[in-house]
């Protein structure tokens, strides 16, 4: 039984099977506070909110620090071991990374909502980090799944806790990587609470590189003679986050602790994601030891616009096909979460997807009623596009329920009726499981 343990408590609880990967969660604690019976971020105490840096904290009275140290310790504990809460009367575990995302990562709409699909994503990602055979995740995503923000949050979460490490970002173009860096990564860092924020060099909102290290200051006679213990003990992490232009050799020869690969299914010629992964994979290892991980996620472009190479990479990351060293062909582990798990408007106030049409309406996260299940809604949309082969094909591509849907090609690229071809492929796939077909070596009777 090939189980990856993500528990940091020394005890194992439930074992999840996510797309073929068995993952052992920690055991639930004896007492979990019920609270609101759903996820709500905790209010950041206003006495701490006004503290901007660790230096300001040091200047406070010991009595103030003693009062707030248990709160700060608890935050570090949750970051390291994950967090349990009660959600709709169910004991629910989220990883430390997921907790940091929900509680401390400011995104475009404020703090993110809790979603069950993201919980499963983070549990899978935690297993990728814990498994010494794995180089990271190859995530085939749906539109608006929040991956870019989640990856940005993980970059800051890891970088603020790592010394002497490098973090890199790639996207479908250099401009896209820069936008992710300036619009997502940097704001999350700025809004972190002081106790998670290391000393930063350079501008508050850097455009090129975010460096957690001590700014170089000129040594003067006065600074050398200073007896201020904080100045003497001043040590930065010497950790940097940056991005590179898209190219087959981006990050060649560098050592990375985390490589975020956003929009990897959209690398258009002459850039080739397969070639780049061949290069960047070596940034994550020393000899045969894996020292860094890749967080890769994308929807798939049309096959001749980068989709075909991404499909090959995804298929060579299948957990069920390992070599004798226990690794997949690419070294990554593939994950696909179908659209019905994460479709806006069909997620209830507990963050759970509403698959089937409910008998009485269910309350959404903002108090809005959900009266139709996501599957019925999806089928209704497909039904309405029956006469429009391009529209129907695009519906499957944009809102995929299977990897086959996600990797469909755009119809305008084909001389043939792709919808009919895909229908036949789906039909043939179904036949395999019906017992109508029998596979084997046949010999003629009386022949």
Please describe what each predicted stretch is.
Residues 1-447:
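Phosphate/NTP-binding elements of NTP-utilizing enzymes
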């Amino acid at each position: 039984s090939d189980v990856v343990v993500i528990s940091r408590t020394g005890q194992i609880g439930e074992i999840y099977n996510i797309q073929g990967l068995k993952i052992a969660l920690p055991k639930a604690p004896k007492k979990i506070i019920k609270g609101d019976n759903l996820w709500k971020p905790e209010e950041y105490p206003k006495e701490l909110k006004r503290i901007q840096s660790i230096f300001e904290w040091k200047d406070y009275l010991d009595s103030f620090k003693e009062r707030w140290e248990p709160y700060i310790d608890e935050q570090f504990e949750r970051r390291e071991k994950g967090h349990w809460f009660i959600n709709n009367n169910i004991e629910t575990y989220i990883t430390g990374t997921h907790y940091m995302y929900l509680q401390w990562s400011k995104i475009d709409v404020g703090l993110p909502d809790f979603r069950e699909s993201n919980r499963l994503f983070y549990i899978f990602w935690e297993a990728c980090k814990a498994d010494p055979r794995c180089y990271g995740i190859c995530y085939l995503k749906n539109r608006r799944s929040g991956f870019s923000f989640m990856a940005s949050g993980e970059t800051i979460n890891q970088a603020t806790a790592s010394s002497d490490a490098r973090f890199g970002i790639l996207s479908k173009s250099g401009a896209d990587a820069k936008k992710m860096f300036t619009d997502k990564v940097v704001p999350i860092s700025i809004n972190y609470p002081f106790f998670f924020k290391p000393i930063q060099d350079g501008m508050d909102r850097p455009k090129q590189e975010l460096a957690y290290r001590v700014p170089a200051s000129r040594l003067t006679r006065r600074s050398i003679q200073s007896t201020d213990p904080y100045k003497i003990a001043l040590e930065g992490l010497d950790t940097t986050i940056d991005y590179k232009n898209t190219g087959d050799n981006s990050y060649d020869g560098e050592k990375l602790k985390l490589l975020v690969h956003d929009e990897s299914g959209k690398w258009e010629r002459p850039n080739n994601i397969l070639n780049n992964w061949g290069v960047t994979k070596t940034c994550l290892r020393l000899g045969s030891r894996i020292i860094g991980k890749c967080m890769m996620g994308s929807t798939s472009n049309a096959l001749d616009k980068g989709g075909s190479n991404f499909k090959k990479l995804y298929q060579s990351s299948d957990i069920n096909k390992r070599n004798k060293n226990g690794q997949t062909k690419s070294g990554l582990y593939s994950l696909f979460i179908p659209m019905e798990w994460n479709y806006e408007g069909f997620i209830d106030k507990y963050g759970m997807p509403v698959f089937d049409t409910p008998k009485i309406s269910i309350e959404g996260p903002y108090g809005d009623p959900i009266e139709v299940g996501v599957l019925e809604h999806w089928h209704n949309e497909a039904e309405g596009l029956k006469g429009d082969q391009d529209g129907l094909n695009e519906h499957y591509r944009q809102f995929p329920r299977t990897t086959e849907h996600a990797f469909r090609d755009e119809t305008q690229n084909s001389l043939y009726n792709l919808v009919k071809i895909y229908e036949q492929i789906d039909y043939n796939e179904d036949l395999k499981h019906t017992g109508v077909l029998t596979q084997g070596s046949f010999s003629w009777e009386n022949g």
